[in-house]
């Protein structure tokens, strides 16, 4: 994690107000996603055999990176050590983006970006795209703790302030609901598969099987079972020191469903319910999300 470590050390010396900047109305990390990095993304050439992983922040991205790497290794018979940097394209400096062209397939590329801000070839080249969503109440709680543990991002002043910013979309990578509505438009695209964090927590073996089939990476039942066993959240936390070094505790906290109940006031819960229903009621994504089960 040496590159990430040096970036975090740079950020630790910065004032909180300098850690984010606004681009086209959306906040991004000054250290991880400077303008030249996002500018260069316009030239990134996806391939049809790329594996693309997308998630709004704190919806299970790092968990699914680990699962996908295990699926790739098991299916291809390789045992590759994961690279030191997370596969988020918006974190890759321009020189690294250019080196990506030389990477052998299958390449695992990830992003927290809104679909409108992704490299155009993510859609024109028709690679398979896995999108992970999580209920908004647990997402905002996880995001709040992440802000307070990650030196690259400014500290959240308070839970109430961060909740308010999340509700208006004034957080890094933009509005959760804007992301959700953008993927709702693509929910029937055969190259897009949307999975729910809560469903994966409920039945990880089934999730591993569906994901491997979607990416045409066949696994035996034994491999599915083994990958699921190694990828429970508790196993990931245990292994996080090895996989993420000192940053393991930043990326993996509780991973629970329902932790929002320890943070939300009754008024905040009602406010989120109203916003959720005004934005997503009647959508196909809402039908998958099972909001009433996980957020009441």
Swiss-Prot record:
Alphabetized UniProt keyword annotations: Cytoplasm, Transferase
Keyword field contains DNA repair: no
Entry's localization field: Cytoplasm, Cytosol
pH dependence: Optimum pH is 7-9.
UniProt keyword ATP-binding present: no
Pfam (any one): Sulfotransfer_1
Protein name: Sulfotransferase 6B1
Organism: Danio rerio (Zebrafish)
Taxonomic lineage from the root: Eukaryota, Metazoa, Chordata, Craniata, Vertebrata
UniProt gene name: sult6b1
């Amino acid at each position: 994690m040496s590159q990430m470590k040096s970036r975090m050390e740079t950020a630790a010396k910065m004032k909180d107000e300098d850690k984010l900047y606004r681009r086209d109305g959306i906040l991004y990390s000054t250290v991880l996603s400077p303008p030249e990095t996002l500018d260069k993304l316009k030239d990134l050439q996806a391939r049809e055999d790329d594996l693309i992983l997308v998630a709004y922040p704190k919806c299970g991205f790092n968990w699914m990176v680990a699962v996908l790497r295990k699926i790739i290794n098991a299916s291809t018979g390789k045992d590759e050590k994961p690279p030191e940097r997370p596969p988020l394209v918006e974190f890759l400096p321009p020189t690294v983006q250019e080196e990506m062209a030389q990477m052998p397939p299958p390449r695992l590329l990830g992003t927290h970006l809104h679909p409108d801000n992704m490299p155009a070839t993510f859609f024109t080249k028709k690679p398979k795209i896995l999108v992970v969503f999580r209920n908004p109440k647990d997402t905002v709680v996880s995001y709040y703790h992440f802000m307070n543990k990650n030196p690259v991002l400014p500290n959240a002043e308070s839970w109430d302030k961060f909740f308010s910013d999340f509700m208006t979309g004034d957080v890094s990578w933009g509005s959760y609901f804007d992301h959700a509505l953008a993927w709702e438009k693509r929910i029937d695209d055969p190259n897009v598969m949307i999975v729910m964090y809560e469903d994966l927590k409920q039945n990880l073996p089934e999730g591993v099987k569906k994901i491997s089939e979607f990416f045409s990476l066949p696994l035996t039942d034994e491999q599915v079972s083994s990958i699921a066993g190694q990828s429970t959240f508790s196993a990931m936390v245990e292994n996080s020191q090895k996989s993420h070094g000192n940053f393991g505790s930043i990326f993996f906290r509780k991973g629970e469903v329902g932790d929002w109940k320890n943070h939300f006031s009754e008024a905040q819960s009602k406010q989120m319910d109203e916003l959720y229903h005004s934005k997503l009621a009647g959508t196909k994504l809402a039908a998958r999300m099972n909001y009433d089960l996980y957020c009441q």
